[in-house]
């Protein structure tokens, strides 16, 4: 029971942070959004930990992984990587990853948390709403795959992201993303 109470408390904290992040409204600009994520980065890192939350572990991660089918030959772009826990999951499967987030603080936390995978994961700060920023992640080879877990719905303008992913992926590359279904959105107004 104690674990359940702790989990419920954490869910309340998570909901409060999410409300703060999402509660600004649809007209929230990238800089305003970035500021809120910077302020909440440590909370999210603590809440997601090394293995993410239960919903992600039990529902999202298995399906995304099934669709992505990571293997040691893969060179994967992890979009809006947060604290890097999915990047490390991919690294454990032998893949090489370039992971980015627009929160500098979140990337610092990811580098610290996932330091044992430093040879396989390159963490970068980049803005998913800025095509040029994303294209700067291009290295000496094209990505075999791209992935985004539960982030697309929080990106204010996805067209630059989609254009950049298209350019960065090899011709046979795939882009797998998970997003929140509208029926799970909490109405705040």
Predicted regions: what they are:
Residues 1-24:
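N-terminal amphipathic/basic-hydrophobic helices that include classical n-h-c signal peptides
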Residues 18-71, 85, 89, 109, 174-189, ...:
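Conserved class I S-adenosyl-L-methionine
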Residues 75-79, 83-133:
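Class I SAM-dependent methyltransferase SAM/SAH-binding core
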Residues 159-174:
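A short glycine-rich, Lys/Arg-flanked "PGG" loop and its adjoining helix->strand segment in the class I
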Residues 134-146:
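A short acidic, Gly/Pro-enriched loop at the edge of an enzyme's catalytic core
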Residues 144-158:
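A short SAM/SAH-binding and catalytic strip from SAM-dependent methyltransferases
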């Amino acid at each position: 029971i104690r674990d359940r109470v702790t989990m419920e408390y954490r869910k309340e904290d998570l909901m409060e942070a999410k409300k703060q992040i999402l509660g600004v409204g649809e007209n929230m600009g990238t800089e305003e959004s970035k500021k809120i994520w910077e302020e909440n980065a440590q909370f999210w890192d603590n809440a997601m930990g090394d293995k993410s939350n239960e919903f992600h572990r039990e529902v999202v991660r298995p399906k995304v992984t099934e669709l992505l089918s990571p293997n040691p030959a893969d060179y994967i772009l992890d979009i809006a990587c947060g604290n890097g826990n999915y990047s490390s999951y991919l690294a454990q499967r032998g893949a090489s990853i370039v992971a980015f987030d627009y929160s500098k603080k979140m990337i610092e936390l990811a580098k610290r948390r996932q330091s044992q995978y430093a040879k396989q994961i390159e963490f970068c700060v980049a803005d998913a709403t800025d095509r040029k920023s994303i294209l700067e992640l291009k290295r000496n080879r094209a990505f075999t795959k791209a992935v985004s877990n539960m982030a697309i719905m929080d990106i204010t303008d996805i067209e630059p992201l989609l254009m950049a992913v298209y350019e960065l992926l090899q011709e046979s590359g795939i882009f797998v993303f998970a997003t929140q279904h509208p029926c799970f959105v909490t109405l705040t107004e």
